[in-house]
Amino acid sequence: MSRLPSSFDVEDADVEELSFADKIVYHCKQQPLVPIGTLLTTGAVILAAQNMRIGNRKKTQFYFRWRVGLQAATLAALVAGSFIYGKDKYDQKKKEDQMKEKAKLREQLWIKELERRDAEAQDRKKKAEAARLKTKENEAAIQKLEQELKELEAKASK
């Protein structure tokens, strides 16, 4: 028996349908270097601010330089990730289109199968109705023959 598609088949959730927190997790998994770079840059800014408040100019300058370097590295990771992810997204889109076409074909096959089964059921109903009519005709003929037999027996016994 062929596998028919089910209304319970669940596909991967679309990115637009995800909640805000789920979107953040999704994008962090797609480009893991960007959040790491962002956290390191934030840490460098916080350390620079602490040293500025203390009055330590050398460490403040050191952490601000690290901030610039980490920000540049984060930006490079973002661009590289976008380039790589862009190719993956194109391939994924192509694959999704193929899956949609396959799903449409599967749905059409499913509809044809249901129509075929419906036609078979209709044929069985017609055959059953014809058999019922034939049975009624035969019963009427049997009753007629029985009646004739009784009449003949009645004549024969007289």
Swiss-Prot record:
GO biological process: mitochondrial cytochrome c oxidase assembly; mitochondrial respirasome assembly; regulation of proton transport
Listed GO CC annotations: mitochondrial inner membrane; respiratory chain complex
Keyword Membrane attributed: yes
Pfam families on file: HIG_1_N (PF04588)
Disulfide bond positions: none
HIG1 domain segment(s): 5-96
Cell location: Mitochondrion membrane
Recorded coiled-coil stretches: 99-158
Keywords associated with the record: Coiled coil, Membrane, Mitochondrion, Transmembrane, Transmembrane helix
Membrane topology according to the record: Multi-pass membrane protein
Transmembrane segments: 32-54, 64-86
Quaternary structure note: Associates with the respiratory chain complex III/complex IV supercomplex.
Function: Cytochrome c oxidase subunit which plays a role in assembly of respiratory supercomplexes.
Family: Belongs to the RCF1 family.
Name recorded for this polypeptide: Respiratory supercomplex factor 1, mitochondrial
Gene: RCF1
